[in-house]
Amino acid sequence: MPEPAKSAPAPKKGSKKAVTKAQKKDGRKRKRSRKESYSVYVYKVLKQVHPDTGISSKAMGIMNSFVNDIFERIAGEASRLPHYNKRSTITSREIQTAVRLLLPGELAKHAVSEGTKAVTKYTSAK
């Protein structure tokens, strides 16, 4: 006599497991929204500086937050500078001035030299 087919046990009420596949009513998977971050670039720089060192996801989140913060500060300052001089264009000069105003001493000098190097590399590649 064949045994009745065993079905999977029903999940307990208040179970901690969540449904992993998000599906619409018609059965298709819902497309996940992409979250932009600088994690790929932070990781590349880390490997250039310390090839044998890793980074935790929490530390990567902090680095991503830091890069976003600095970007917003530089962009904000650079957008105010042309207004003072009655101009309507943000150039590399405004970015450079914003960096000089925001970053202290030696850090500003290094940032400006690295930025100049990056702009030169970009223009020569065109």
Swiss-Prot record:
UniProt modified residues of type N6-(beta-hydroxybutyryl)lysine: K6, K12, K17, K21, K35, K86, K117, K121
Record-listed N6-crotonyllysine modification sites: K6, K12, K13, K16, K17, K21, K24, K35
Give residues where Omega-N-methylarginine occurs: R87, R93
- The record places the cross-link (Glycyl lysine isopeptide (Lys-Gly) (interchain with G-Cter in SUMO2)) at K6, K21
Name the residue ranges with Low complexity bias.
Answer: 1-12
List residues modified as N6,N6-dimethyllysine: K58
List residues, modification PolyADP-ribosyl glutamic acid. Answer: E36
Residues bearing N6-methyllysine are K47, K109
Q: Which residues carry this modification: N6-butyryllysine?
A: K6, K21
Where are residues bearing N6-acetyllysine located in the sequence?
K6, K12, K13, K16, K17, K21, K24, K86
Post-translational modification, briefly?
Monoubiquitination at Lys-35 (H2BK34Ub) by the MSL1/MSL2 dimer is required for histone H3 'Lys-4' (H3K4me) and 'Lys-79' (H3K79me) methylation and transcription activation at specific gene loci, such as HOXA9 and MEIS1 loci. Similarly, monoubiquitination at Lys-121 (H2BK120Ub) by the RNF20/40 complex gives a specific tag for epigenetic transcriptional activation and is also prerequisite for histone H3 'Lys-4' and 'Lys-79' methylation. It also functions cooperatively with the FACT dimer to stimulate elongation by RNA polymerase II.
| N6-(2-hydroxyisobutyryl)lysine PTM positions | K6, K13, K21, K24, K25, K35, K44, K47, K58, K86, K109, K117, K121
Q: Which positions carry N-acetylproline?
A: P2
The PTM Dimethylated arginine maps to R80
Q: Which Pfam families match?
A: Histone
Keyword line: Acetylation, ADP-ribosylation, Antibiotic, Antimicrobial, Chromosome, DNA-binding, Glycoprotein, Hydroxylation, Isopeptide bond, Methylation, Nucleosome core, Nucleus, Phosphoprotein, Ubl conjugation
Q: Which residues carry this modification: ADP-ribosylserine?
A: S7
Q: Where is this region: Disordered?
A: 1-36
Phosphoserine sites (modified residues) = S15, S37
Q: Which domain of life is it from?
A: Eukaryota
Q: Which residues carry this modification: N6-malonyllysine?
A: K117
Q: Where is this cross-link: Glycyl lysine isopeptide (Lys-Gly) (interchain with G-Cter in ubiquitin)?
A: K35, K121
Q: Name one GO molecular function term.
A: protein heterodimerization activity
- Hey, which family's this protein in? Belongs to the histone H2B family.
Q: What does this protein do?
A: Core component of nucleosome. Nucleosomes wrap and compact DNA into chromatin, limiting DNA accessibility to the cellular machineries which require DNA as a template. Histones thereby play a central role in transcription regulation, DNA repair, DNA replication and chromosomal stability. DNA accessibility is regulated via a complex set of post-translational modifications of histones, also called histone code, and nucleosome remodeling. Has broad antibacterial activity. May contribute to the formation of the functional antimicrobial barrier of the colonic epithelium, and to the bactericidal activity of amniotic fluid.
Q: What is the name of this protein?
A: Histone H2B type F-S
**Organism, as annotated:** Homo sapiens (Human)
Q: Which gene encodes it?
A: H2BC12L
